Amino acid sequence: MKKIIATTLACALLTSATAQAANVTLLNVSYDPTRELYKNINGAFAAQWKQKTGDNVTINMSHNGSGAQSRAIIDGLDADVATLALAYDIDAIADRAKLLPKDWQKRLPQGSTPYTSTIVFLVRKGNPWKVKDWPDLVKPGIHVVTPNPKTSGGARWSYLAAWAYAEKAPGGNKDKAKAFVANLYKHVPVLDTGARGATTTFAQRGIGDVLLSWENEAHLALEEAGGADKFQIVYPSNSILAEPPVALIDKNVGRHGTRKVAEAYLQFLYTKDAQEIEAKNFYRPRDQGVLKAHGADFPNIPLYTIDDVFGGWTKAQQVHFADGGVFDQIYKPGQ
């Protein structure tokens, strides 16, 4: 009888130990204006993972300009996943730190971009400068707020959107595009390091007449208390297809033992539930059904692509944003 009791007790203890939930922590290193998005995504994923596995998962976040975040991971910031503003910033992690394979974009659908965005104009209520399109950003006396493309992914997308407009306009070419963008930056009084800082400069500090903004960030400014009474969004005649990618940081998840959860987390971003969250946070979902359901929030304007106009991110980075590149040639602080 004692033997039976002992065996039963041992089995019960073993079952209890097996059933005990594991506690897993991930670090998502993201770009500047994704705070609200990933707060909602993380809660939904944690609940789903708990239901599926019984384990508890906590996702910690780090936010900054995309270029700054890329350099931080290269320098040792221990990310399990990176959700940055553009592919070049993850390419740099693969090339310089060898933390993930160079073909990382092939591992998830749509080039590892579960959602897209674009660049729009946020202006003050009533649009006192009557801003309608890109040429209005160089009116005499107008001030434009945009972050520093050396540190901010959104700023690079904004710069390239302006360039694409000028190059592809009737009679446009690369020389005219360079002149237009150089003129545009003469109207920029301050360069913040990231998109959220630029939004704060415009919306809270009252600096500038136009904010070059991620679409989601512009909508967020309207949704904040009193925002709809202070600001309005202007969609230009065309803009750029911004594709913020996501990636597993292989060497880090290998050391942490978090690969399974981290992979599931990134795959979750493509699910219908997550796509709905992304749409509600004003990111354009890849799921066409979800996109159609939220169509009123996403005007259909022509969007140039990085590949078609600039030959991809590697070339665009080298030509425009590397030390001594076009941006360094045209931007003179205080001019």
Regions found by a protein language model. Name each.
Residues 113-117, 178-185, 192-193, 225-259, ...:
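Periplasmic-binding protein-like
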Residues 253-335:
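Extracellular/periplasmic juxtamembrane helices and adjacent flexible linkers that interface
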Residues 29-31, 123-125, 143-170, 185-188, ...:
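Short beta-strand->loop
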Residues 17-21:
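Sec/Tat signal peptide C-region and signal peptidase I cleavage site
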Residues 6-16:
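Bacterial N-terminal signal peptides
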